[in-house]
Amino acid sequence: LVGCHYDSDVMTLEGTIKNVKQVDLYVYAEGSMNPRVDTIRVRGGAFTYERKLTAPEVLTLLYPNFSEMLLVAEPGSEVELVADASNLSETVIKGTKENELLTEFRHATARKSERERRLAAQQFIYDNVQTHAAVAVFREYFVKAENPIYLEAQPLLDTLSLAQPDNELLRAMLVRFTPRLLCAVGQKVPTFEEISLTG
């Protein structure tokens, strides 16, 4: 590694994972303009990953046990991940304000019930509405929910859209999520027409 090397469009993620020597992780940006899946090879409990970016992205780290963790990747940023394979909920991701916000949120909600985490997610989004961290939390707790709740999700979506009108990641997410939201629990059935067999 060359210490003075720096690319303004590259995000560097340095990681250490206790209680594991060799494993492969997968990283991808769901719903972004750059949907490729990369493999991160952890060797000796450590790894380095670089990703070229044109704009901030919310990345998903997929572990071998299929648990997921979100992080915000920004062009030119240097991010550090410190984890323990035996307790991934205590993972620390630091180096940028966005990822430190996500780490604080994860730690604060780790032992809460699903409903309590969802309520905490709503408050986090309102408190940090101009951040990519808020978009990440919205995606995790509302977009990826099996049964999104319209009365909870729609006001958050409206608030995020107003606060971040130029966020391409948010716009792409809206295109995919809005049809699901229109059919969510609590919504009216959309108007439609049907032609019978007899015309």
Predicted segments, located by residue:
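A non-transmembrane, solvent-exposed segment enriched in polar/low-complexity residues
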Residues: 4-128
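Alpha-helical repeat scaffolds
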Residues: 117-121, 150-160, 188-194
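Short solvent-exposed coil/turn linkers within tandem alpha-helical repeat scaffolds
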Residues: 127-131, 163-171
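Amphipathic alpha-helical repeat scaffolds of TPR domains
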Residues: 130-141
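Short coil/turn linking the two alpha-helices of tandem helical-hairpin repeats
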Residues: 142-147
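N-terminal "domain-start" segment that seeds a small globular fold
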Residues: 171-199
